[in-house]
Amino acid sequence: MSATFVAHVRARPETVRLAPEGAPTIAVRVEMPEVWDVVRFAVSPAEPTINLKRRALEELAPDMGEHHEDFVFKLRGWEVLDENAPLAEVGVVDGSILLLTHRRKRPVRRGG
């Protein structure tokens, strides 16, 4: 599969750009299962991971009112431990899919 194909599957129509116009970028997707939503980003491989995480939270969960420390970024099923490292350094490449989810599992509330 190509990075272009992966970037467009079930995502919002717009791409959020985190790099200056004309700068080299990679396309990544950030998925958040709690809100069943996906956002595409055009971002520099040198961008600190924490910046992408914060911007993704603004896009995907602006009303959650929680701090970014309450969430974890996962790449290929593994938690990104050094969020200050550049995206390329933690293994993000063109077409990568990052999962943004609560750090701790939350209990399921049953109605009734």
Residue map of PLM features:
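Ubiquitin system architectures
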Residues: M1-G112
